[in-house]
Amino acid sequence: MEKTVEIYTDGSCLGNPGPGGYGIFMIYNEHEKKLSQGYKLTTNNRMEMLGAIVALEVLTRPCVINITTDSQYVKQGIESWITNWKKRGWLTSAKKPVKNVDLWKRLDLACAKHTVTWKWVKGHSGHKYNEIVDDLARDAAGSKDLLDDVGYQP
């Protein structure tokens, strides 16, 4: 039987574009895990996506995932928009290249390994776990240990 994992993610960007980070809080039974990382130059949407991607990629076996985000961009993108983007060769309905295509492809692949249910929560509304991941993301964005977001294109 597959494990059920609760995942909460958030992204933050100081400037947009600017330094950014993601925060992840994972719960499996009584086990909890926090992850975060900051990047030198990125956007809030990339950090929202990367939080979800990293959370899914760290799981070594297929799981049942309930992932909660405050990003409508990520939730709608993966649940609705991505199907047509792939049919159109990663072009929008306006025939323009999909932004953050590197991360959309990675998120699509990461989701395929699991059974994922996406949930949306309003940011900064007092939701316990969303506040935790928001703090993790902001702290990561402001840290000295920043990586290069190699896929970021201004």
UniProtKB/Swiss-Prot annotation:
It catalyses: Endonucleolytic cleavage to 5'-phosphomonoester. GO terms for molecular function: magnesium ion binding; nucleic acid binding; RNA-DNA hybrid ribonuclease activity. One of its GO terms (biological process) is DNA replication, removal of RNA primer. Gene3D superfamilies: Ribonuclease H-like superfamily/Ribonuclease H (3.30.420.10). Keywords: Cytoplasm, Endonuclease, Hydrolase, Magnesium, Metal-binding, Nuclease. Binds 1 Mg(2+) ion per subunit. May bind a second metal ion at a regulatory site, or after substrate binding. Mg(2+) 1 binds at residues 10, 48, 70. Its EC number is 3.1.26.4. Its cofactor is Mg(2+). It is an enzyme of class 3 (hydrolase). Mg(2+) 2 binds at residues 10, 134. CDD domains: RNase_HI_prokaryote_like (cd09278). It is found in: Cytoplasm. Residues 1-142 form the RNase H type-1 domain. Endonuclease that specifically degrades the RNA of RNA-DNA hybrids. Belongs to the RNase H family. Monomer. HAMAP family: RNase_H. This is Ribonuclease H.
